[in-house]
């Protein structure tokens, strides 16, 4: 139940960009998973990390990391949208992108599938960080 004092997420514009651009998108999930964020802090591209793990790349398309930008900013929203889409189009081609020093954003038909994309990448980041 929402109260009259409820405020939308500061990341509302990021969610809006992604929802408007993809007819199949029903859920945009933005989280701050520890291991994904740590891997990006080490300078790693999430899309490169998952290449060695077929259980991820078979089911989850990971795009390039978004550079460090201010949280809740229009710049972060636009950069996230750009990272998830195909070269100057609004066609979304990735399921998830990392946002350096911030978190990740995933899209899917429902929140559970979007969360599963995040969970897969988080699991691999934990493995890679433990092995390094």
Which functions belong to the PLM regions below?
Residues 1-132:
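Glycine-rich flexible loops
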């Amino acid at each position: 139940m929402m109260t009259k004092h409820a405020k939308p997420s500061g990341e509302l514009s990021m969610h809006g960009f992604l929802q408007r651009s993809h007819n199949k998108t029903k859920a945009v999930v933005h989280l701050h998973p520890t291991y994904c964020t740590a891997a990006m802090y080490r300078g790693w591209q999430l899309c490169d990390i998952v290449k060695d793990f077929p259980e991820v790349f078979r089911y989850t398309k990971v795009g390039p990391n978004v550079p460090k930008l201010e949280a809740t900013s229009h710049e972060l929203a636009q950069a996230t949208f750009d990272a998830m889409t195909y070269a100057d189009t609004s066609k979304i081609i990735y399921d998830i992108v990392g946002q350096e020093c911030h978190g990740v954003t995933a899209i899917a038909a429902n929140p559970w599938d979007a969360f599963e994309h995040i969970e897969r990448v988080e699991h691999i980041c934990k493995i890679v960080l433990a092995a390094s």
